[in-house]
Amino acid sequence: MQIRGKEVDFRVSRLKDAAALELAINNMGKKEEEIRKEKTLTAVISKTNEMFRQFFIDATGTDVLVDCEDLQESKETYTEFLRGVGEQKNKILDFSVSDIK
C-alpha cells in the first residue's frame, strides 16, 4: 500500500494488521477527547497532526507523516488510507465458499 509516496506493508486481511488498526482507532478516540479541550488554534492543529501521525505509527508501524505540518494534508492522508482499507475489506467480504471449485 502506498501512503504519501512510501510503500507500507499493510493488509487488513492479515490478523496482526487488523489488530493494529483497531488499536490505532481506539487510541485516536482517546486523543480526540483531549484535543477538544484545547483553546488555541495552533494547539488544535499541532495535537491533531500528532494524533494522525500516531495513528499511522500504531496502525502500520510507519511514520508516514513525519515531515507533515499541514493539518489538511494529514486529514487527506488519513482519509485515503481508510478508503484503501475499505477496498481491502470489500475484497475480503466478497469471498464465498461457493466460489471454490
What is each of the regions a protein language model found here?
Residues L15-K101:
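Short, surface-exposed, charged amphipathic helix/loop patches that serve as local interaction elements
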Residues M1-D17:
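Short, extreme N-terminal segment that most often corresponds to the first beta-strand
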